[in-house]
A protein has these predicted regions:
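Helix-loop-helix junctions that connect adjacent transmembrane helices in secondary transporters/permeases
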Residues: 155-247, 408-479, 679-701
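Extended active-site and interfacial segments that coordinate phosphate-rich ligands
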Residues: 22-26, 130-139, 143, 234, ...
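Short acidic, glycine/serine/threonine-rich loops at helix termini
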Residues: 85-90, 128-131, 231, 240-242, ...
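Flexible, low-hydrophobicity surface segments
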Residues: 1-172, 197-200
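Thiamine diphosphate
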Residues: 241, 260, 264-285, 289-290, ...
């Protein structure tokens, strides 16, 4: 189902259709090559020795027994990397941390890489790890942000004790990496005038992105000093740049070939294995292939932050928000980089609030370094804010959506993080929820006597953009080879090709999109931040406009007239003064040799204006008051897509994000031992929702065009994860009358809350 909010008048021929994805046949027939499918003749296999401790000092590493083994071809420790500074508090999310690739002199989490080896087979490489003798001094560890900020907590990074602390962190310990403050108006005065104030504290645990394909890399470092990497990542240019920096070699010496990728959700942006495979290849003189197993993925790759969040909202008697504050402490794991800015942008974004203060703290602890996960930071704060708003609505005896619509953000208003809204779809998305049959239908009673409830929640992602390039080669038969630089995770190749085809009025099946390697196409930023359809789509649009201009020039040459006498429409050029003179796209393509040679369109750009996206969910649940188990009965997902280039893919993103959000709300968490070991390191034990757990999710596309894009595109890959957490929580609250403040709402935690209330 699609809601055409204000886009019905737009007349597109390709955009808004649902063509078969260009890579679909290869993927369903098994012909698509993923990273682990790639091999080179004579390759070695690399494996990693990981720390058995959550926090320890490395006293010595004895490699003598390994080096004696006839099938050991290379061994790598931190000393083999280029000299790099120790991570400071200023390290941002996504910055390469060499010490996370291999530990320097301390390990900071169980699973932290210490040594890498290469051997003639993966089994031998695994055996070699047992020959390495590492002596550790085990140190006290800390695993929760609320505990890590204490001055008494063990300090992870010793040198931080001598660095200046972030502002306004009095009474906190040296594990605080950053404190960010955003404010407008005067929140304290706003609360003084408020007729009703609600304040709550929430806790969420680390969850993993749960991509189906583990990390992998194959490297070959030639004798001439040229490094080629084949890997599955969310950005091969980022892998190239980060690997070159970690290894201390020129970017020009590294080529990265992108393989197909089996999911990422933000977790496959940083390099993990690529630098290791590269150095092992350099030392052995042979190609080296590496891949993680699932235990390694969960033990040692970035989850999202665990958190402690405090939200306070004050409203007038009629529900108008007078003031709001948010204080959140996000764990970043072993190294700094928690998504404070993303959380600050999202926390109150759906609403117009004059008086706001936001405090975000980045806290390191003894867990794997966190990485991005669909709208980094936003789902956590949306869970808190949307839960508080539902409590406000309940206290005021007000419809939850009426409260939200009354306070909805609009164009021209300033977000708390300083951004002034352009055209946005907050109210349109809320109104779509309010008017939907799901929201207005009776919930019904459970035949088994269980408690039922219906909840709503709003979400937001600011969306990002970045640099993007595209090259369009027109072929003599009128087809087009379109080379772009964005790794395809969610069907973006087809969405990019649709935007190209729309400009030229040709069939999208005649456009053949490819993801080029780092030597083939210009720099393109990572597939993340919901930016691909926006930035690479815009690059395709610009390349198509370049082709269109050249088509007009070729026709003018054939007709011996000026270019202002030629126009282009619906895949044909025609003479303005003589309608009988007309040529199709294919006809001009066939005449390229006679009119000047190849037609190649290109684009290199760094567009701004990606435009934020709003989402919402209506979720019905059933709660078993005896066991605490929550079952999902019905789900409707809403999202402002700006313009839905390929509605199937938009709906798929909405459904997928909703599933992940429900998993975050109900099941997903790391079970940690007292020693910092993650105990559920398989997908049997790390419980993600399956089709057996959920009903069909009904997607509703809202279209409020983004004025910052030629076709009005907004990214749709992330905001959809933010709303389900609160929608499930609010549904459970309305079913039971009990507000559960911690995620996940597992049967055990819900049952405990019921017992306490009883």
């Amino acid at each position: 189902m699609a809601s055409k909010t204000d886009s019905a008048s737009r007349d597109y021929s390709v955009i808004g259709t649902r063509p078969v994805r260009h890579d679909g046949v290869d993927k369903v027939t098994g012909h698509a090559l993923y990273g682990a499918d790639f091999s080179l003749a004579g390759q070695l296999y690399g494996k990693v020795l990981r720390s058995p401790h959550a926090h320890a000092r490395i006293l010595s590493i004895d490699l003598s027994n390994v080096l004696k083994h006839p099938e050991a071809k290379a061994v790598v420790t931190f000393e083999d990397f280029a000299d790099s500074p120790r991570p400071s508090r200023a390290y941002a999310q996504g910055a390469p941390v060499t010490e996370n690739i291999l530990a320097r002199d301390k390990v900071f989490y169980k699973g932290h890489p210490v040594v890498a080896v290469a051997a003639t087979s993966p089994h031998v490489a695994e055996q070699l790890l047992s020959l390495i003798d590492v002596e550790y001094e085990v140190l006290p560890a800390v695993f929760k942000p609320q505990e890590a900020i204490s001055p008494e907590a063990p300090i992870l990074h010793d040198h931080w004790a001598n660095e200046a602390m972030p502002d306004d962190t009095e009474g906190m310990g040296a594990n605080v990496a950053a404190h960010e403050v955003y404010q407008q108006g005067n929140a304290e005065k706003g609360f003084e005038t408020a007729a009703h104030v609600v304040e709550r504290e929430f806790n969420t645990k680390s969850v993993h992105q749960g991509y189906i394909e583990p990390q992998n890399a194959t490297a070959y470092w030639t004798p001439e000093g040229r490094l080629t990497l084949w890997c599955s990542s969310q950005g091969h240019f980022s892998v190239r740049d980060n690997t070159a920096e970690i290894l201390g070699i020129p970017i020009s010496a590294v080529k990265v070939v992108p393989m197909e990728i089996g999911g990422g959700f933000g977790g496959k942006i940083p390099p993990y294995l690529e630098p290791l495979a590269a150095v092992l290849s350099k030392k052995s003189g042979l190609p080296v292939k590496m891949y993680m197993d699932r235990t390694e993925v969960i033990q040692a790759t970035g989850p999202t932050s665990g958190s402690h969040v405090k939200v306070k909202i004050g409203v007038s008697a009629n529900g108008k928000i007078e003031a709001a504050t948010a204080n959140f402490k996000f764990e970043s794991g072993a190294y700094p980089g928690a998504p404070l800015a993303g959380a600050a942008a999202a926390v109150f974004a759906p609403y117009a609030i004059d008086n706001v203060r936001i405090d975000g703290f980045d806290v390191v602890d003894n867990k794997p370094k966190t990485q991005a996960y669909r709208a980094p930071g936003a789902p956590i704060v949306a869970f808190a804010v949307e839960s508080v708003l539902d409590d406000v609505a309940s206290d005021l005896n007000m419809d939850p959506m009426d409260l939200r619509i009354l306070n909805s953000a609009h164009e021209g208003q300033r977000r708390a993080d300083g951004v002034i809204n352009l055209r946005i779809g907050a109210e349109e998305t809320m109104t779509a929820v309010k008017n939907h049959p799901h929201y207005n239908s009776p919930l019904g009673d459970s035949p088994s006597g269980k408690k039922r409830g219906r909840g709503v929640g709003m979400g937001f992602c600011r969306n990002n953009t970045g640099m993007a390039c595209a090259i369009a080669n027109v072929l003599p038969d009128g087809n087009v080879s379109l080379i772009e630089g964005s790794v395809d995770i969610g069907g973006s190749r087809t969405a990019i090709a649709q935007q190209f085809a729309e400009v030229l009025g040709i069939d999208v099946t005649e456009v053949h999109p490819y993801v080029g390697d780092t030597d083939t196409v210009g720099y393109t930023s990572v597939t993340g931040g919901s930016g691909v359809a926006f930035k690479s789509g815009w690059a395709a649009y610009t390349a198509a406009m370049d082709v269109k201009t050249q088509m007009i020039e070729r026709a003018a040459l054939l007709w011996d007239c000026s270019i202002d006498q030629v126009d282009y429409k619906n895949g044909r050029v025609f003479h303005i003064s003589d309608p009988e003179l007309s040529l199709s796209f294919k006809e001009i393509a066939g005449n390229m040799p006679e009119t000047g040679g190849p037609i190649v369109g290109s684009a290199n750009m760094n567009p701004g204006g990606s435009g934020g996206s709003y989402s919402a969910n209506i979720i019905d649940v059933e709660v078993d008051m005896e066991t605490g188990k929550i079952d999902i009965l019905r789900v409707t997902a809403f999202q402002d897509a700006g313009t839905a280039i390929h509605p199937d893919y938009v709906e798929g993103q909405m459904q997928g994000g909703t599933v992940q959000g429900i998993g975050w709300a109900l099941n997903e968490e790391f079970f940690m031992g007292s020693d910092g070991a993650i105990l559920n390191t398989s997908l049997l034990d790390y419980r993600m929702p399956t089709s057996l757990d959920l009903p069909m999710i009904d997607p509703v596309i809202v279209e409020v065009p983004n004025p910052g894009h030629p076709f009005g595109v907004r990214g749709v890959g992330e905001a959809n994860l933010s709303a389900p957490l609160a929608a499930v929580s609010n549904a459970a609250f309305r079913a039971t009358g009990i507000r559960i403040l911690d995620l996940p709402m597992s049967p055990d935690s819900v049952h405990s809350a019921i017992d306490k209330t009883s």
